[in-house]
């Protein structure tokens, strides 16, 4: 099959420069670090070039939402008990930031992947004056 395989693993107190902390790991691996302040947690979360998904666990809902809003990732899960971490509504777009930011899937963001946005600015006359006609 190729590639590396690792059994489901939880890595505790991962060093900041470790590959499992700085790069995306696709597989059953959870890298865990603790932080003393919100600022430290946000700085660490945003220090990587990747931003596919992050999780904030806290017993304080206001703190969890405050931190989640500051993390640069395509999906941030805020939870107090780990429930619902993968429960997403299909109307919610999925995609990452930074080096993980290759497009979006699902939701309005996914729809926009298949459209071209164009702005036309008219000055000095109204659209009624221009007698707009359908061109397609």
Q: Which residues fall in each region the model found?
A:
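Conserved C-terminal structural/oligomerization subdomain of aldehyde/semialdehyde dehydrogenase
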Residues: 5-136
């Amino acid at each position: 099959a190729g590639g590396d395989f690792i059994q489901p693993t939880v890595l505790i107190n991962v060093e900041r420069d470790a590959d499992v902390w700085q790069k995306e790991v696709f597989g059953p691996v959870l890298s865990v670090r603790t932080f003393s302040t919100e600022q430290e947690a946000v700085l660490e979360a945003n220090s990587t070039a990747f931003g596919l998904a992050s999780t904030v666990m806290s017993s304080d809902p206001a703190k969890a939402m405050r931190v989640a809003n500051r993390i640069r990732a395509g999906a941030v899960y805020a939870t107090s008990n780990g429930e619902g971490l993968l429960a997403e509504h299909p109307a919610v777009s999925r995609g990452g930031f930074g080096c993980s930011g290759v497009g979006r899937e699902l939701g309005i963001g996914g729809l926009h992947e298949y459209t071209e946005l164009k702005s036309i600015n008219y000055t000095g006359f109204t659209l009624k004056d221009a007698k707009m006609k359908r061109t397609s």
